[in-house]
Amino acid sequence: KKNGSIVMIGASYAEGWPVSQINDKPVVNKGGYGEKTAEMLARFQRDVIDLNPESVIIWGFINDIFDANRSRIDTVLHQTRANLREMVSMAQASGIEPILATEVTIRPQSGLKEAVLGFIGKLLGKQSYQDYVNQKVTTINDWIKTYAVTNQIRLLDLQPLLADENGARAKKYAAPDGSHISPAGYNVMTRYAEHELQSE
């Protein structure tokens, strides 16, 4: 019998989400710092299936992008999609409800030096690193949303919650490194998850 809990598997964004329960269901945090989807998949049996939860939130692929050589990014993202699909089917095969979540975009590090470099980059017509990362995040997010609808999988669309009008991370929802999530960001996410994951 399922124990009624929700496991959250992901990387450091997931690891840092201080949510102990969602709608009175205990949340078991299995975020792993710096992990890519291949590493999440490798421990999925041990950290998700073996715990016999009611559902699993599968969230996070940004390290696949961070760690990839730009010249190989398309191959890497092909594998990212395969890894996410495999986690979904492993959960379903064990009677655990998979819940997919979109990745959040990033913003430049806060600081004058970063602002100046970003400005110079724009003048030179170069795509900034965060624009490159965010473009790839958006590509996979679009795939996740379509995949979720097509396969009737519940979705937590986290990206727009933390985004500014340009689709990058809003400053108030970012840690100073521009990548990790501020306490205010996590608060917004928790309220949203409670609303979205109410039992039908």
PLM feature segments, named:
Residues 93-98, 153:
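A short helix->loop->beta-strand "cap" motif at the edges of active sites that frequently abuts
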Residues 2, 40, 44-47, 145, ...:
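Histidine-centered active-site loop/cap adjacent to the catalytic His
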Residues 22, 110-120, 164-172:
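Short, flexible, mixed-charge acidic loops at enzyme active sites
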Residues 110-158:
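Substrate-gating cap/lid alpha-helix
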Residues 72-79, 128-139, 173, 177, ...:
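Alpha-helix N-cap and loop-to-helix initiation/capping positions
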Residues 15-17, 65-67, 107-111, 163-165:
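Short catalytic/ligand-binding loop motif for oxyanion handling, primarily in non-cytosolic enzymes
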Residues 60-62, 103, 158-160:
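Active-site loop/turn elements of alpha/beta-hydrolase fold enzymes
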Residues 1-86, 90:
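Conserved SGNH/GDSL esterase-like catalytic core that processes O-acyl groups on lipids
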